[in-house]
Amino acid sequence: MAQGGLSGQEYGLHSPHSREFERIPPMGKKEELIVGLDLGTTKVCTVVGEVTTEGLDIVGVGTYPSAGLRGGVVVNIDQTVNSIKKAVEEAELMAGCDISSVFAGVAGTHVQSLNSHGVIAIKSREVTQSDVTRVLDAAKTIALPFDRQILHVLPQQYIVDDQDGIHHPIGMAGVRLEAKVHIITAMTSAVQNIVKCCERAQLQVQDVVLESLASSGAVLDSDEKQLGVALIDIGGGTSEIAVFQNNAIRHSTVVGLGGNHITSDISVGLRCAMDEAEKIKKKYGCALAEAVNQQEVIEVGSVGGQKPRQLAQSILTQIIEARTKEILDIIEWELVRSGFIESLHAGVVLTGGVSLLPGIRELAERVFDMPVRIGVPCNFGGLGDVVKNPIYSTAAGLLLYGKDHGGGLPMRDSRGRLGSIFETFKRWWREFW
């Protein structure tokens, strides 16, 4: 299988615990649109994709600084709604359409996962779709606190009469069907607040999707998932981990550390404002102290109206390397705890905004003692080159999830597309370059 989303069956089903919102069914098949909405700690990103016979064409991208979110969780409804509206408006301008529904990502340390299994008797001695549905229902029958809900039930394998390793059991003969699954749960209130913010921004939520699951569809290929790979999505407020082996997700967790913690350390260490620290990190940052010229000097803005100061770049790099290594060490501990670190024969794939930090791949290879690559969304048509950046991994992956789940909606042109693409692309180019 080429790079792209998981199949609908691999993504799994929601449970009765997640009925706080209803999925919006697809509307028509002509010129279909899918929209992914990534609600991050540092940015809100909207990506619009058009379903084609070849796959997906990117037709619109919008980003806006995130306000009202912390660690992937909504902490201010009004600010979050405003960020969503701005990102959606920019994507609409580029795509030349009106956006009415989205696939929204969810993240945060409130997300938890576990492995489960279910067993049923096969009524007709041949596995049917009804049997598969029943065994998944049995597997997701778990005790949950009242304030949590199931987001995903992800099949790992099916077993028919002790024959294991089956991924597509329909049509097979047998009397006993077993399913081993990976279940992802989240705080109900956190999911409800995401849905509420989208609705206040005049958007219907077609589904809420774990962000690392979405990212995996955009940046991992089938060979990596088969051999064993860890996807590590390091964003502004959290670092998300998803481990795949034998083409199924085996472990997932979220670490409450990300790029903002690096920025905070820079702010304290260099005695400058957070905004200044973020600019310095992006302009001069490096995750390996040995990789920078020890004689190089940078200018640092001061607080309280004082004059800017000059400091050795090596001081900045030492601060960044220390915090980045701490984040990677914690992630390695999570991989050891999962029991799969020795099975990652395809290594580690880093994505998310922090993966753009120079030197982080080399540092990660030292920490994990295995090959590491930077994952970017690939195999998109249209404006696909625009999203070939780790910051778009989640939003692009949400498009693939939506495509696999028949989430296309008919496109309504609201303005001339070529002109709007040109104007928005110029804004995007100025912002990121």
Please state what every model-predicted region is:
Residues D221-D223, G353-V367:
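Short glycine/threonine-rich loop-to-helix capping motif typified by GTGT followed
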Residues Q245:
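A cytosolic small-molecule/anion-sensing beta-strand core signal
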Residues E240-A242:
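A structural feature that tracks compact, well-ordered secondary-structure segments
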Residues I234, R323-E332:
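A general structural motif
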Residues A104-T109, A346-L356:
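Glycine-rich beta-strand-to-loop/alpha-helix junction loops that act as flexible
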